[in-house]
Amino acid sequence: MGYEKSPRPLARGGSPQRVRLVHGDNRGYGVTMSPQVFENLSDLSRLPWFDLHDGRLVVSDQSVAPVIDMHTHIALAYLLPMRVDLYRATPHTEHYLPACCRIDFEVYQNKNFTPAALSTLKRDLTLGSLSRGGMRATHTVPNLVREMDELGIVHSVLLPIELPYISKNAVHALDAARREPKVISFGSVHPIVDRVGTRLDEQAHAGARGVKVHPAVQLIMPDHPRAMALYRHCGARNLPVLLHCGPVGIELQSGRRRTQVALYEKPIAEEPRTTFVLGHAGALQMEQALDLACRYPNVWLELSGQSLANVRTILERADPERVVYGSDCPFYHQAIGIAKVLMATVGREHLRAKVLYQNAARLLGLQRSRHNA
């Protein structure tokens, strides 16, 4: 059995290409005949699950929904108060990977950045964080919800990142979740601040469904004693910890040193009551993260950024009950990660609902739906 879609001209020239996805290689898993490289974001509409509506990429196959995105952000602010209007809709969301960029599913996702786009990203996240403009001005709640609605995403999880005493990103994310029912928020407490347990209780009372930890941004080793104490507090409160896990290749050397997957085993092993979701599934060290997930039942893998081949490997070898979809929006359009899950599950569609919805719903304690009844 296969899926076919009529040829569509490529946006940057080239020959029309028919997409044909067939299932059933010699292991019984899905195989993508073509394509794995797309000329731009709109070119994903050549896949059988997507189409273009008024120039915007949408999911056209209603069987894909519902979806939960476990890894999203709105604009973050440090040093100065938040200057972006988080509730302002703009005509377009400026993703850090621009919609015009070529997208290669065979590589880790950030390998698709051009030098110019990467430079713009870094400038927007650093100096731009002090302003009310730039790309960050489009990283708002209504823009996120618009993209969700176009793709069948019923919930997106916001992941705020705090630095000691100079940010209130968790406050803004939790406020967004209170205002917008399609948004869920994790909390964030920097491990070195005082009253960690009290702060976690306050955030949980405000609606936090878990805690985000980013060793590279928060400048702390994942196995630091204060980080270990934070994980222990989270486990006692049944708050899953979503960790940025693994080097991504574009961070500072200090960040690369703090995100080596080997450093995550100590907290995982010593805090078995705590659920650890390894963001980006270990990034460029996917095999090491997959090994942790195979050896420890308190480890989940979140797929944002991974190549199509790595998504297939994870779904083949990991416990499919502990794998979740994430996009890392607004770094990337939410459709990119969905497309990889759909392509990786051709011929084993029973895994789709687990990865796209059921597992995240269970982790977040959401009510049962028709997809996990």
Regions found by a protein language model. Give the residues of each.
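Ligand-binding grooves and catalytic loops that recognize ribose/phosphate and carbohydrate rings
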Residues: 198-208, 213-230, 248-251, 257, ...
